[in-house]
């Protein structure tokens, strides 16, 4: 299924891989996918994202990685089959386990954050196409506690739930052309609702909205001529629309800053809930599209060549959704790729 909207081709991987899936048995709670006895983590339904001369970027909240003894095996196999240039992760609980996994992947290298504790960030990138230049953990030098006033700039880290955004300066090349990118990995405060209450500095939605104000201001004033992609788990609970206060500084046309940004997965946000990145498989809450990729103005010119989608993990692994949630993640990855 292909939809052409907002100058972006939005592709559902679910439709693609459903045509190419094997004749395996129904997903079960105990078997690790449609693998075989030799390698139970060989997933024939998993689809390569790698395309010649394109940049592929995947964002994924990988839920307290590794949450299960099999998590690393699942994730390593999937990352290698997807074969994307750039992966941005949230919720890395064990840096050593992440490092161990990537060290066993000969084609990839990693960068981890220093400031986010046991729910950290990681960049994993393909050695043949990506050069890591530097990182900057934004607002890591600001207080991370509620000071009780309405000035969100003087305790910016608190607005980001003590997880300072990890800005990665990288260079992509295919050997004939190259592009510098600033990719900012975020993980906003969870919970609450979708009501902005400016009188309560501890309110979850208040903090998420302020986090977006900080980011839009930073990019507009410091990276206006650079290629910037903001990715991650925005935790935009409540109504799934461009006016949700969590994301509105990027997406609401009534807010001036939104003219500088484009959420490339907006059609997923405003589409059917069955296509959202978070399905609530083991939760009483309704599905929501929490995971986004947002570009700034210099990248608008590539809109017509940009493809985005949610990677449907139960289909990719031929594994029951509850098993996916408990052994891999309760979030599904979201990807974008484009011709630079």
What are the residue ranges of the model-derived segments?
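Metal-dependent phosphoester-hydrolase catalytic domains
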Residues: 37-39, 160, 220-229, 236-340
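C-terminal motif of bacterial Sec signal peptides marking the signal peptidase cleavage site
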Residues: 16-18
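Acidic/histidine-rich helix-loop elements
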Residues: 59-71, 150-153, 192-207
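Structural recognition of the beta-strand scaffold that forms the well-ordered cores
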Residues: 56-59, 85-91, 111-113, 120-125, ...
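Structured beta-strand-rich core segments of catalytic domains in phosphoester-bond hydrolases
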Residues: 92-94, 98-189
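Active-site-proximal beta-strand elements of phosphoester/diester hydrolases
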Residues: 54-64, 136-137, 180-193, 197
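N-terminal, active-site-proximal structural segment of metallo-dependent hydrolase catalytic domains
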Residues: 20-109, 115-121, 156, 212-213, ...
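Bacterial N-terminal signal peptides that target proteins for export
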Residues: 1-9
């Amino acid at each position: 299924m292909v939809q052409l909207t907002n100058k972006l081709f939005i592709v559902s991987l679910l439709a693609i891989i459903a045509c190419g899936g094997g004749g395996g048995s129904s997903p079960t709670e105990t078997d690790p996918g449609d693998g075989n006895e030799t390698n139970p983590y060989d997933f024939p339904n998993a689809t390569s994202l790698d395309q010649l001369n394109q940049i592929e970027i995947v964002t994924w909240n990988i839920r307290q990685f590794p949450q299960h003894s099999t998590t690393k095996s699942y994730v390593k196999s999937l990352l290698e089959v997807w074969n994307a240039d750039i992966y941005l992760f949230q919720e890395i609980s064990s840096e050593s386990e992440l490092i161990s996994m990537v060290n066993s992947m000969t084609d990839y290298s990693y960068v981890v954050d220093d400031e986010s504790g046991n729910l950290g960030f990681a960049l994993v990138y393909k050695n043949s196409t990506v050069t890591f230049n530097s990182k900057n953990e934004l607002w890591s030098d600001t207080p991370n506690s509620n000071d009780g006033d309405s000035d969100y700039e003087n305790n910016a880290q608190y607005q980001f739930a003590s997880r300072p955004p990890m800005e990665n300066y990288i260079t992509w090349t295919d050997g004939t052309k190259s592009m510098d990118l600033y990719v900012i990995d975020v993980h906003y405060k969870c919970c609450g609702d979708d009501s902005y209450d400016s009188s309560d500095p501890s309110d979850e939605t208040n903090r998420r909205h302020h986090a977006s104000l900080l980011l839009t201001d930073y990019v507009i004033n410091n990276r206006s001529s650079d290629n910037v992609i903001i990715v991650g788990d925005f935790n935009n609970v409540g109504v799934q629309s461009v006016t949700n206060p969590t994301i509105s500084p990027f997406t609401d046309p009534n807010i001036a800053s939104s003219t500088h940004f484009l959420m490339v997965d907006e059609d997923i946000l405003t589409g059917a809930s069955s296509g959202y990145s978070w399905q609530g498989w083991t939760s009483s809450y309704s599905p929501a599209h929490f995971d986004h990729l947002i570009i700034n103005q210099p990248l608008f010119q590539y809109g017509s060549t940009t493809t985005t989608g949610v990677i449907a993990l139960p289909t990719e692994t031929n594994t029951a959704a509850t098993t996916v949630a408990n052994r891999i993640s309760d979030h599904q990855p979201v990807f974008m790729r484009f011709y630079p």
